[in-house]
Amino acid sequence: MSYIEELGIKAKAAEKSIATASTIQKNNALKAISTALIDNTSFIIEQNKLDLDNAVDSGMSKAMQDRLMLDERRIKAVSNSILTLTDMEDVIGSIDYGTIRPNGLRICKSRVPLGVIGIIYESRPNVTVDAATLCLKAGNAVILKGGKEAFNSNVCLINVMRKAVETVGLPADIVQLVEDTSRESTNELMKLNKYLDVLIPRGGAGLINAVIANATVPVIETGVGNCHVYVDDSADIEMAVEITDNAKTQRPSVCNAIENLLVHKDIAEEFLPKVKSVLDKHNVEIRGCEKTAQILGDSVTLADEKDFGTEFLDYIIAVKVVDSVEEAIAHVGKYGTNHSECIVTKSLQNAEKFQREVDAAAVYVNASTRFTDGEEFGFGAEIGISTQKLHARGPMGLKELTTVKYLINGNGQIR
């Protein structure tokens, strides 16, 4: 029996305990985890520093190091987000739909856990806690497979959480970590159909495409974020500058940050110098089309086809001047990843057209794409941003970690 199969067996054995746990017991487990994270802050930071030191030695970019880093403020924020989960309604057992048929049958559509969830993700250790606690609240067992970049942080966080859930009478194996960081273990996890009910990848295009291509377990695809802001000819320029700045520089290494800026030709000469002066403060590299280079000069690197389709996750942005809202929509359709897209405009007609015709999980008018987030949408923490159309789309909160069961009650009806 392999190591991965052993994890699957343990998760399946623990599944019933969490699936049938009361709301009070689940909330007590979450509170115990929240407290344990605060109590172990110094040790968590110490283990995280080992990962950060390795990241520096390996030449990891500053933006990606920021994704990896845990400090006292971030640990406290994660702890508080867990407490937010305890305040949220327990979706398990809730009724989506109910009816009484003409023959007297009472039919209800009820929410139940998915079962055992596998999650494969990269270098963000906060995902370890977010994913585990969301799965717990939704009544699921979880097997986590983090990236090797965050190995020490993840082992520490998992051990803290496993000890915490045991204090409230739940089995530690409702939360497990694959401590083998090899590609072989990832491939085996993708094929663990006997024990996993669903697999959720979180990370870059390479990881997600590999999971989609190789998994035999059902997959919920979460998003590569090649996101756009389109500045329409009627846009409020100051608003457009502020939205672009926030969407690109506030945290460039996350999937809801923009990678492309599209600007209507009639506003480009006024807008582009203003947005460049703001982006320059963050040392953002601009890769622009020929028209962009004509307006902004030699400081702009000429963009090629690849740039418009790249999720940089860094202080780099591709810029294109377009002739119309139709061209902007076509560009998004060609290069976008169905994640988050934005139009800045005063035109109600263009706003409605953009929201109607752009195919994405979240389509914004006059607001930053950085809001595509479970907390910001009022769902609590999220497991990821789904960019597919089956089962779930957009930020995946508690409800998206459940499925349905039909409950039918009769008094002897036969067909």
Annotate each PLM feature.
Residues 115-119, 133-134, 140-142, 173-176, ...:
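Structural motif
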Residues 304-415:
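Conserved C-terminal structural/oligomerization subdomain of aldehyde/semialdehyde dehydrogenase
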Residues 87, 96-238:
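Rossmann-like NAD(P) dinucleotide-binding subdomain of oxidoreductase/dehydrogenase enzymes
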Residues 1-107:
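N-terminal Rossmann-like NAD(P)+-binding subdomain of aldehyde/semialdehyde dehydrogenases
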Residues 2, 123-126, 130-137, 167, ...:
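ALDH superfamily catalytic-core signature
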Residues 21-27, 169-175, 250-257, 285-291, ...:
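Flexible, glycine/charged-enriched surface loops at secondary-structure junctions
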